[in-house]
């Protein structure tokens, strides 16, 4: 993480973002970033210990924030299960919408994560999110059963594929450079599509 908060720091952050966006992590050059900031490479290392450290500083706050918000909303959903019938499950949650709004409020960070993170500790972030969602879905279904709501069994391998495709679909708006307005409109339709599908395969709809 950044070591120095001098007046040059913002200039370095901007140059680093442009470098990673242009060349990707693997081909990005600390020397080129330093040159674009009109400073020496050794001067750059006073701010960041490595290229990995620099990339992490650009994406980690937004990525961590997404996971924290997800867990908070998940806790609220668990608490609300007792007040729902089978027909109400997942209705009106608009999970994809709030995720999309968060992504676009932190667009630069997620553009790097989605498109330029190969070679970093974040290159499998979608798999990590899918694993979180998979475990959360399994726990959610168990809580439904505890509250007397029956569901159809789904093989764990299939569930993993369904969840992964769902997560990938959310981030496709970043890949294809949707505007925030376009992305939110798409997210609303994706929510409707996914909720209908989940309810169908879990036997929560007629």
Spans of features found by a protein language model:
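Secondary-structure edge/capping motif, primarily at the C-terminal ends of alpha-helices
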Residues: 73, 77-81, 110-117, 144, ...
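Short, basic, alpha-helical segments at the C-terminal edge of helix-turn-helix-like DNA-binding modules
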Residues: 30, 60-67, 74
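C-terminal/domain-terminus segments
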Residues: 17, 113-130, 182-198
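Hydrophobic alpha-helical connector segments
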Residues: 57, 71-102
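Amphipathic alpha-helical packing segments from all-alpha helical-bundle domains
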Residues: 95-105, 120-146, 157-164
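Hydrophobic/aromatic-rich alpha-helical bundle segments in the mid-to-C-terminal region
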Residues: 141-194, 202-206
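Helix-turn-helix
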Residues: 11, 15, 19-53, 57
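Alpha-helical DNA-contacting segments of helix-turn-helix folds
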Residues: 56-62, 125
